Regions:
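Extracytoplasmic/secreted envelope proteins and their assembly/folding machinery
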Residues: 23-27, 57-61, 120-127, 172-175, ...
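Non-catalytic propeptide/linker segments at domain boundaries
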Residues: 1-5
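Catalytic-core regions of hydrolytic enzymes
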Residues: 13-89
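Envelope-exposed proteins and targeting segments
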Residues: 33-35, 69-71, 96-100, 153-157
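Active-site-adjacent substrate-binding region
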Residues: 115-142
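A short, glycine/acidic-enriched catalytic loop
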Residues: 80-115
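Active-site-adjacent mobile loop/cap segments within catalytic or ligand-binding domains
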Residues: 138-187
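Second-shell loop/turn segments in exported
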Residues: 6-19, 42-54, 60-61, 108-117, ...
Length: 187
């Protein structure tokens, strides 16, 4: 078995020990709150990162044909560096949760991205709601000059879940709180 707490470019195709497992946790919580969820676990970055956004774009477009939505969450684990034990976490009640971080793409790289300001607004509002409910759950968001397929939705974002130093349990705990924030946000 693999330990989720690895560093560098460690990847596994074992869904029980990857960010896909964290996505399962988020999906289960959101379904419990009445959200309609499609959780795709296709490996787009294995065996290589090159071309992963092209491959994932095709997957998302196919999903959107039969399940139209504006909310698209692309969960990642932040790979801080190969020698880092950095584990951004926050204590919420008796729980230790991995901190989350939005990564929002823009049209700054020259690619068509008409929704980037709407996506940014969504992330800002969700982060504000999270700060009201669970201060420290989110780190400061990053805005980049790439679009990360976020042009496909009006509430599309990457959410980095912890880092290579966080445990799987901490990352899964974060999903409990993220799902509550999403539920409150939509009310």
């Amino acid at each position: 078995q693999y330990n989720y707490q690895q560093t560098g470019n460690f990847r596994t195709t074992d869904l029980n020990f990857s960010v896909a497992r964290v996505g399962d946790e988020l999906a289960n919580y959101l379904i419990g709150y009445g959200f309609n969820v499609v959780h795709d676990k296709t490996y787009h970055d294995y065996p290589a990162y090159t071309g992963s956004y092209t491959r994932s774009k095709a997957t998302v477009e196919n999903i959107l044909q039969s399940n139209p939505t504006d909310i698209i969450i692309d969960l990642h684990r932040d790979a801080i560096g190969s020698k880092s034990n950095y584990d951004p976490s926050v204590k919420i009640g008796d729980d230790v949760a991995a901190q989350l971080m939005f990564v929002i793409g823009t049209n700054g790289g020259g690619l068509y991205h008409p929704n980037w300001q709407t996506n940014l607004k969504f992330a800002i509002e969700l982060e504000q709601k999270a700060n009201e409910m669970y201060p420290g759950l989110f780190k400061t968001m990053i805005v980049r000059n790439s679009r990360y397929n976020q042009h496909l939705g009006k509430a599309a974002t990457i959410i980095e879940v912890g880092s290579t130093g966080n445990t799987l349990e901490q990352c899964m705990t974060s999903m409990k709180y993220l799902s509550k924030v999403l539920d409150e946000y939509r009310k």
